[in-house]
């Protein structure tokens, strides 16, 4: 009886610690587990890696010709975006991607890092950590570093982004410099999404000041079309 009680108590402590130690959101772990159940990444795959902006895209549908060609080789366009993810969270799930040595990887993140009150220095350092790991563990993967997209504070939906519009341009300038240093392709999406005469996301292509409507994804699709093939 004492042994049973001891085991029960140990289990309860473990569960409690697990709940306390949970590093990311429930959605993060849900998506992570979904990825685990999918077919593994292979060398023909094109991976789009990022946060909610990436998760919200129907990438294989945007590029049906490329998807069909990849399917013939056993590959696919793979959406590896997770709502709320950060550079740190992305780093922690690279083990689901890099062993497959994908053909191409298009990477975008930063908005959630900004909302967590991280400095531009820290954000860029964490993104650099992700990029260097990709280059080290999958050196033949063609990496495309996409700039942060603008957001629009006037919607007043995301309080943690208030007063931080200026950070986007600051981070992007450093990311462009980093891309040159690492000899990877930088895709500057930022100006394509701006409201004319401002540094804010065009309100016509967003419903909440951060995430994109269909029209926004069409702009994105056109901007990366030459890389997703």
Residue ranges of model-derived segments:
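Single-residue recognition of alpha-helix boundary sites
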Residues: 13-14, 62, 158, 224
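Sec-dependent signal peptide recognition
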Residues: 2-10
């Amino acid at each position: 009886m004492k042994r049973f009680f001891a085991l029960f108590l140990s289990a309860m402590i473990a569960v409690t610690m697990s709940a306390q130690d949970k590093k990311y959101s429930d959605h993060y772990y849900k998506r992570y587990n979904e990825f685990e159940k999918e077919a593994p990444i292979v060398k023909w795959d094109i991976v789009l890696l990022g946060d909610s902006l990436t998760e919200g895209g129907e990438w294989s549908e945007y590029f049906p010709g490329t998807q069909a060609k990849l399917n013939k080789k056993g590959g696919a366009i793979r959406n590896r975006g997770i709502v709320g993810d950060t550079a740190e969270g992305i780093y922690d799930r690279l083990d689901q991607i890099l062993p497959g040595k994908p053909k191409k990887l298009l990477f975008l993140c930063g908005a959630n890092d900004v909302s967590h009150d991280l400095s531009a220095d820290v954000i860029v350092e964490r993104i650099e950590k992700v990029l260097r790991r990709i280059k080290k563990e999958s050196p033949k993967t063609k990496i495309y570093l996409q700039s942060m997209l603008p957001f629009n504070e006037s919607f007043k939906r995301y309080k943690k982004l208030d007063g931080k519009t200026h950070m986007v341009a600051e981070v992007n300038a450093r990311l462009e410099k980093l891309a040159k240093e690492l000899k990877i392709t930088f895709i500057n999406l930022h100006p394509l999404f701006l409201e004319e005469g401002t540094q804010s996301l065009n309100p016509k292509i967003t419903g909440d000041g951060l995430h994109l409507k269909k029209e926004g994804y069409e702009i994105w699709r056109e901007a990366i079309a030459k890389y997703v093939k």
